């Protein structure tokens, strides 16, 4: 175990086995801290599953993995369905019982190829994830990680409906090192896997109790007025200066004025701060990958940097 920031300990374990993919790593950590669900889109072989498994092992969390397909049945996701016959006064009574498993008993679940799930199963699945309940009974799930291949024709993949995609607060794009031309990191991967043993057991670094303690801290973490104003300015800038509207983006009040506050706080905790700072506005990169047009998303660092600079310059002017 460790007395250091528990989330940095989890990051260390991911870094030991996976080179690069910083956006995915930070997204997973923000999801664990905030207990919000995560959507990752990227081609096969970009460490999506491996990173989720590393976090669950290092944090001693019960992990469930399932690869969805066109014939996925709900029972495959929630446990075994037992059907029995019992005699009754009016004849034979047929009863069904669910022996809980899958997402009903896991603390982290990874739902691979979620967009391939049939509509009926997907709707029930998303309702369970949203409510974190099954027949009014709470489930222990901290965060669900849904993955999908890019929706290009060659992957024979259909995109999630925007309303369904919006249920995943954290959204990130995973890219391979080769096509991303990250040649230095590619060489590091080759070196790492040339030297590491074939079998490697991820050590236990964090307990569920520690994660619970930090989640309690999350709600009380201060968001100063200047950070609140910066968030409002961020949304206003996207709409007023970049022409975003209902037809070209998905900027919901729920996501940007409620859920975004949890992500700001989670980002502050990840960086060992006891209150949010203007720099935590960069966490908005992890909720906007599929809510904004690609060309606007690519400018996000610049947009956020400008907003932070304006706030800091205003503060300096007022102090004079």
Protein language model features and the residues they cover:
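Conserved alpha-helical scaffold flanking the Walker A/P-loop in AAA+ ATPase domains
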Residues: 27-30, 83-109
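Conserved C-terminal "switch" segment of AAA+ ATPases
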Residues: 3, 17-18, 172-246, 273
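Walker A/P-loop
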Residues: 29-71
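Canonical AAA+ ATPase core
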Residues: 84-89, 108, 113-124, 130-206, ...
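C-terminal engagement/docking regions of AAA+ P-loop ATPases
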Residues: 47, 240-320
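Short loop/turn elements that form and flank the Walker-type P-loop nucleotide-binding site
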Residues: 26, 33-35, 59, 103-105, ...
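Pre-Walker A (pre-P-loop) alpha-helix and adjacent loop at the N terminus of AAA/AAA+ ATPase modules
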Residues: 4-43
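Conserved Walker
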Residues: 19, 41-43, 65-67, 89-100, ...
């Amino acid at each position: 175990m460790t007395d250091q920031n528990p989330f940095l300990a989890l990051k260390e374990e991911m870094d030991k086995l996976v080179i690069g993919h910083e956006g995915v790593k930070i997204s997973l950590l923000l999801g664990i801290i905030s207990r919000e669900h995560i959507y990752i889109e990227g081609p096969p072989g970009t460490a999506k599953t491996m990173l989720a498994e590393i976090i669950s092992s290092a944090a001693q969390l019960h992990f469930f993995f399932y690869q969805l397909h066109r014939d996925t049945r709900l029972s495959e996701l929630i446990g075994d369905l037992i059907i029995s016959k019992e005699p009754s006064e009016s004849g034979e009574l047929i009863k069904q019982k669910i022996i809980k498993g899958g997402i009903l008993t896991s603390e982290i679940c990874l739902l691979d190829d979620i967009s391939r799930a049939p509509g009926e199963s997907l709707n029930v699945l998303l309702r369970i994830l949203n409510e974190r309940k099954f027949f009014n009974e709470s489930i222990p799930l901290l965060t669900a990680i849904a993955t999908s291949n890019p929706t290009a024709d060659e992957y024979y993949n259909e995109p999630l409906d925007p309303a369904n995609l919006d249920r995943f607060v954290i959204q990130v794009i995973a890219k391979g090192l080769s096509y991303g031309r990250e040649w230095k990191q590619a060489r590091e991967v080759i070196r790492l896997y040339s030297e590491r043993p074939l079998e490697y057991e991820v050590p236990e670094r964090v307990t569920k109790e520690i994660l619970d303690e930090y989640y309690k801290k999350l709600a009380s973490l201060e968001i100063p007025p200047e950070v609140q104003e910066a968030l409002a300015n961020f949304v206003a800038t996207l709409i007023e200066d970049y022409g975003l509207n209902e037809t070209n983006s998905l900027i919901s009040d729920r996501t940007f004025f409620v859920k975004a506050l949890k992500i700001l706080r989670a980002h502050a905790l990840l960086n060992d701060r006891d209150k949010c700072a203007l720099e935590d506005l960069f966490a908005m990169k992890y909720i906007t990958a599929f809510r904004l047009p690609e060309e606007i998303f690519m400018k996000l660092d610049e947009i956020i940097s400008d907003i932070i600079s304006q706030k800091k310059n205003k503060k300096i002017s007022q102090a004079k």
